[in-house]
Each structure stands twice: as structure tokens, then as C-alpha cells.
């Protein structure tokens, strides 16, 4: 496993440390989460500390399978939300497409989706700007060509 995000690369010792915790080998999700939670929070903080487009009604985290075992997530702000129709996520008025959060890992899409859902849920629980996110009508996540899951709705 190689881990990378758009803010930099962890060292070999970071990787070794992430594999062994108290002498036990951890599962893939645990290893990824150990290394990536802080990085993901920093990425989101950099985005959310700024004023976002006032037309945004809902937020979606688009997931992508890139090449060479890379997976990325972008934050998208949309001008609509419809709990019965996932097409609301296409109504983009804001996106971080040019600056996604990227991980590198050999895995299937379902495990990667579970990983990113965990990161977003953790941010919604304890992230610096969680309250700002919760001001929107809804927060969804999913692969851009698949079904969305609503993680938060008010």
C-alpha cells in the first residue's frame, strides 16, 4: 500500500508505523484511516474556511477511481437538492475538481467508498467547520457514476 494525498507524501516510517500498532497488523481501512483522517480534515478545513458560493443548497462528495490504484474525492456545492433524485448532485455551482483529495491504495470501489464515508462522517462529528457543512440542506457522497448516499439532511 502506498498512501498519498494532494498535500504531500508520508515517509516510509509513517507507512511502517501505520501497519503495526501495538504489535498487531491492522486492516486496510484502519491503516488508511490512521494516516488519512488528519490529512482529510486539513484538506476540508482549507476549503471550508473560505466563504462558499451563496447559491449552494447542498454538498456532495464525488468519488472517482483514477489510474494506478489512485482514488480521489472532490467537494461539490449544488444549487438544488432532491432526496428522491440523485441528479441534484449534477447542479454544480462550486467544485474542488482541480484540487481533489487523493489516496493511493489497491482496493475495490466498495471499500474505498466505505473509507470515504467514514472520513466524512467523522468530519461531520468533530471537524472544525462541521457546523458550516450542516447549514446546507444535505450532504451526500458517492461515485460520480453511481448511487449517492445521504449522510446528513436537515
Language model region names:
Residues 71-110, 151-152:
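Intrinsically disordered, low-complexity regulatory segments enriched in Ser/Thr/Pro
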Amino acid at each position: 500500500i502506498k498512501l498519498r494525498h494532494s498535500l504531500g507524501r508520508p515517509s516510509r516510517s509513517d507507512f511502517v508505523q501505520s501497519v503495526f500498532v501495538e504489535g498487531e497488523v491492522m486492516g486496510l481501512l484502519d491503516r488508511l484511516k490512521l494516516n488519512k483522517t488528519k490529512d482529510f480534515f486539513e484538506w476540508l478545513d482549507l476549503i471550508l474556511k473560505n466563504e462558499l458560493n451563496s447559491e449552494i443548497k447542498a454538498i456532495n462528495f464525488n468519488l472517482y477511481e483514477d489510474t494506478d490504484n489512485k482514488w480521489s474525492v472532490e467537494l461539490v456545492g449544488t444549487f438544488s437538492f432532491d432526496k428522491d433524485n440523485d441528479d441534484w448532485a449534477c447542479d454544480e455551482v462550486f467544485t474542488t475538481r482541480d484540487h481533489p483529495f487523493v489516496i493511493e491504495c489497491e482496493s475495490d470501489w466498495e471499500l474505498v467508498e466505505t473509507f470515504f464515508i467514514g472520513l466524512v462522517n467523522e468530519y461531520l462529528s468533530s471537524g472544525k467547520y462541521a457546523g458550516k457543512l450542516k447549514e446546507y440542506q444535505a450532504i451526500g457522497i458517492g461515485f460520480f457514476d453511481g448511487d449517492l448516499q445521504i449522510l446528513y439532511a436537515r
